[in-house]
Amino acid sequence: LSFLTIHLLMSSPRLEKLQAFLSASPDDPFLLFAVAKEYESLKDTQEALAYYLAIRAKQPAYVGLYYHLGKLYEQLSQPQQAWEAYTAGMEVAKLARDQHALGELAGARLNLGDEEDFT
């Protein structure tokens, strides 16, 4: 664990509890997502990104991931990666027949720019 991670764990009882749950269920996408969101709230974008990418690697069908991953990439000034996250999420949402998520992802991608900007 890095010094920053240890400091954040000490300053965030919620993060400490989530990490304890996660140690018992390391592949649980909901817990991974909750930890990522907690790191985001603590302004540790790199740790948040690492957890989002862990979800994508372990549970790529977790549709809730892609909108937040894309938004984080936007925050990190990585629009190409944001575009790719939204596009991948749209495919996952289509397969899951999740029209609400599909609409949110399509809207986020549209707000990012035109397809010609990213393909």
Please report, for each region that a protein language model flagged, where it lies by residue:
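Structural marker of alpha-solenoid helical repeat scaffolds
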Residues: 24, 58, 92-96
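Residue at a conserved register position within TPR or TPR-like alpha-solenoid repeats
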Residues: 39, 73, 106-109, 113
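Alpha-helical linker/edge segments of TPR/alpha-solenoid repeat scaffolds
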Residues: 80-84, 108-119
